[in-house]
């Protein structure tokens, strides 16, 4: 078996957990990962603001019963997740949030 790099291992774990959709903003930290999404069967939905991505992921999970992933960038992008995280928490909605190392 060929060795996986970090990005390939990350995407493989997403597949193992049934992630099919990711919402958010891709920055330079996520470029290598986002390049692997199409082959892995993960659709990325680019949004204008991280908060939108979080709210869309919450709605997607509530309407389908399948977990979605949100992606944010450092700094203000991460703080844009506050409202969607709290909304998902109070509604008991599972959500995977991913941010680059800050």
Segments (PLM) and residue ranges:
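N-terminal alpha/beta PP-like core and its mobile active-site loop of ThDP/TPP-dependent enzymes
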Residues: 1-102
């Amino acid at each position: 078996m060929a060795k996986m790099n970090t990005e390939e291992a990350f995407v493989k774990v997403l597949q193992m957990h049934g992630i099919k959709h990711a919402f958010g903003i891709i920055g330079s930290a996520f470029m290598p990962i986002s390049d692997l999404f199409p082959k892995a069967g993960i659709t990325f939905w680019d949004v204008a603001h991280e908060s939108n991505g979080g709210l869309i992921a919450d709605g997607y999970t509530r309407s389908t019963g399948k977990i979605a992933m949100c992606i944010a960038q450092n700094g203000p992008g991460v703080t844009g997740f506050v409202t969607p995280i709290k909304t998902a928490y109070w509604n008991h909605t599972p959500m995977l949030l991913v941010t680059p190392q800050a």
